[in-house]
Amino acid sequence: MAKFKIRPATASDCSDILRLIKELAKYEYMEDQVMLTEKDLLEDGFGEHPFYHCLIAEVPKEHWTPEGHSIVGFAMYYFTYDPWIGKLLYLEDFFVMSDYRGFGIGSEILKNLSQVAMKCRCSSMHFLVAEWNEPSINFYKRRGASDLSSEEGWRLFKIDKEYLLKMAAEE
């Protein structure tokens, strides 16, 4: 399959973006953790101050999925800032449906993301990969990615909403 198009997502793509988010979560054995709704995606990504940006991979009608979907991959990203090196593109989610892997779609999405990062004068692109996900780790390493957890010893933490509320209410 040589024909596919990578383009910025539009508000009308939110249902497909959510479908792919759920497919990615299932692939990562975390499907029960997706709480986001299509409405959330619409408000958070396509309002006056979007919290995220998204590229999608779209195939022509002759290559649609058996369920009739033309959108077969996506990359959700946002910009952040590192006080040591400046602007960063943070790749939050990146997924190509399994039947559409091996056709260069993922490589083209990553190329487009790299172009966005360079256009915005970002110093680097950061992202997380599950430790067990060797295919993705190898995909990124072949393109020059370095594993900061093993090379620099960084650990990722999170503070859930209940604890944010608790800290915010402290006097």
UniProtKB/Swiss-Prot annotation:
Keywords: Acyltransferase, Cytoplasm, Transferase
Disulphide bridges: none
GO cellular component, one term: cytosol
Reaction it catalyzes: an alkane-alpha,omega-diamine + acetyl-CoA = an N-acetylalkane-alpha,omega-diamine + CoA + H(+); spermidine + acetyl-CoA = N(1)-acetylspermidine + CoA + H(+); spermine + acetyl-CoA = N(1)-acetylspermine + CoA + H(+)
Coiled coil: none
Pfam family membership, one: Acetyltransf_1
One GO BP annotation of this record: angiogenesis
UniProt binding sites for acetyl-CoA: 94-96, 102-107, 133-136, 140-143
Pathway entry: Amine and polyamine degradation; putrescine degradation; N-acetylputrescine from putrescine: step 1/1
GO terms for MF: diamine N-acetyltransferase activity; identical protein binding; N-acetyltransferase activity; spermidine binding
Domain (N-acetyltransferase) ranges: 4-170
Function, in words: Enzyme which catalyzes the acetylation of polyamines. Substrate specificity: norspermidine = spermidine >> spermine > N(1)-acetylspermine. This highly regulated enzyme allows a fine attenuation of the intracellular concentration of polyamines. Also involved in the regulation of polyamine transport out of cells. Also acts on 1,3-diaminopropane and 1,5-diaminopentane.
Family (UniProt): Belongs to the acetyltransferase family.
Name assigned to this protein: Diamine acetyltransferase 1
Organism this protein belongs to: Cricetulus griseus (Chinese hamster)
